[in-house]
Amino acid sequence: MSPAGKGPAWRQPAILAAAGAAHALSFAPDPLPAWSLAPVQVIALAVAAHASLQAPSARRALARGWLFAMFSFSLGLYWMYVSMHDYGGLAAPLAAAGVLALSAFLALFPGLACAAARWLCPPHWDASPPARARRTLYTAATWAACWAALEWLRAVVLTGFPWLNISYAHVDSPLAGWAPLLGVHGMALLAAFAAAALAGLWQSASGRIDSRQALAAGVALLLAGAGWLLGQFSWSRPEGKPLHLRLVQGNVEQSQKFDPALLETGLRRHLELASLPPRPGEPKPDMIILPETVLPVFQDQLPASVWDAWIEVARRADTRIAMGVPLHTQPDGATGHRYTNSVIGFDASTPVEQLRTGTTAMRYDKQHLVPWGEYVPPGFRWFVDMLDIPLGDFDRGAARQPSFDIAGQRIAFNICYEDLFGPELLPALQDGPDGRPGATIMANVSNLGWFGNTWALRQHLQIGRLRTMETARPMVAATNTGITAAIDARGRVAAALPADRAGVLPVAVQGMTGLTPYARFGDKPALALIGLLLIAAAARGRRPRQP
């Protein structure tokens, strides 16, 4: 009997809840092995597809899709509880309610996708076998387009929160080969199609599978095979010599990081790690990269002696240093003040005054700010006041900012969860209007200590891997508590430090040049394909069926 078959009233909600929980496990290795993530994701989502398509109405389909997604988000984002309760100081019931409220909101998007697909694709058991086979293919494509469209909408509404996009379960599957062409939303379309095609195999009133109903599943297999072939193609080419980098993971406990009494302890730890001599046979680093908010106070609140110490590290190592730091600046001629979450770069020749005023030549200001943590959405000041979050409102950086030019390579920085928003990384990789060439390496600095040693760390690494596949650019990640890593241009983790451990990661990173179709056009091709499928579905899906 299919998952939507007859049975006790509790049966189907229980199946959807279990499938949603299994779905949450598919977004990063541990506890599941990497090879199993894609199959688990497709099978779990197929349960939701089948249940929603066989719902008696679009409203019931919405409820079924929402229930599935509610369990998926609640478990997959459980680490939000850690940030709100353990480090934000929110009472346990309120922190749990916060996670559930966020999950309930996010689950509306999959729920609406299921409702739209059910409205466009009513059950068709009365159709002839050939028509049923054609309708199975059409239904799978329509359901996938609805799901992918709502995934995209989730990425843009209210600044967007596309964490747990289904594509991230497929960084080790053949579908990853499509990333350089269609990006995260195109992969979501293909993954959702595979799930709906599998659901189509269950859509038989007798419980038997008609061979003609396997048409959609066959197309899904062909798309996976094409993805594998595309994955063999090199979309970029090396430029210059490999860049030698030292990535620092300070592992400062989040509960201590912003404690004024422990400020000196954290600074000393990062100074010591940055000052370590290279191991025997290891070349000196061209740049030392430290995580987000290495300095947990604004740069002008520190005495000049702190900056003197950092300049001395750069002088002794004969290198440049990049670090995350909150900046307080007053632009020339401006009467106001700017507060930004930034990365600054400097070397032994950088004047201390530039460091204290935040006017270094190498600088990146975060542009996609975290709601409640880095800016306060209108009407939510009461919620922020309940949380013990330091620093507060920041100003946004420009959409395109200069890369850091180091030893013939050009590094484009992003901060925290900015690597979740692929289109926003692309301007830095493209040649500028002034002819300045695009970046050859991406670098993410973050502080995931807010979430403890949870799934968030491994999920974030998967996100970074997909960004490198989309752009055919390597990425390095320097984090406070993990996972500090180097990812090559094909999305493979070349080296990584264990989480919750202080250390340094010396890596040689080969810069790459050349634009993938996704790096050139962004989400436009995928959205065009999704839009065409939805237009076709709207034009055809509600036509009266011929008897």
Swiss-Prot record:
Tell me the compartments it is located in: Cell inner membrane
Q: Which UniProt keywords apply?
A: Acyltransferase, Cell inner membrane, Cell membrane, Membrane, Transferase, Transmembrane, Transmembrane helix
Q: How does it sit in the membrane?
A: Multi-pass membrane protein
UniProt-listed GO biological process terms: lipoprotein biosynthetic process
Gene3D superfamilies according to UniProt: Carbon-nitrogen hydrolase
Any one Gene Ontology MF annotation carried by this entry is: N-acyltransferase activity
SUPFAM superfamilies reported for this sequence: Carbon-nitrogen hydrolase
| Pathway this chain belongs to | Protein modification; lipoprotein biosynthesis (N-acyl transfer)
The family database entries (CDD domains) matched by this protein are listed as:
ALP_N-acyl_transferase
**Sequence intervals crossing the membrane:** 31-51, 65-85, 89-109, 144-164, 181-201, 215-235
This protein's GO CC annotations: plasma membrane
Q: Which residues form the active site?
A: E292 (proton acceptor), K366, C416 (nucleophile)
Class in the EC hierarchy, top level: transferase
Main location (coarse class): membrane
Instruction: List, alphabetically, the InterPro entries matched.
Output: Apolipo_AcylTrfase (IPR004563), C-N_Hydrolase (IPR003010), C-N_Hydrolase_sf (IPR036526), LNT_N (IPR045378)
* Entry's EC annotation: 2.3.1.269
Function per UniProt: Catalyzes the phospholipid dependent N-acylation of the N-terminal cysteine of apolipoprotein, the last step in lipoprotein maturation.
Q: Which HAMAP family match?
A: Lnt (MF_01148)
Report the PANTHER family cross-referenced here. APOLIPOPROTEIN N-ACYLTRANSFERASE
Q: What is this protein called in UniProt?
A: Putative apolipoprotein N-acyltransferase
Identify the species of origin.
Answer: Bordetella pertussis (strain Tohama I / ATCC BAA-589 / NCTC 13251)
Gene name, please?
lnt
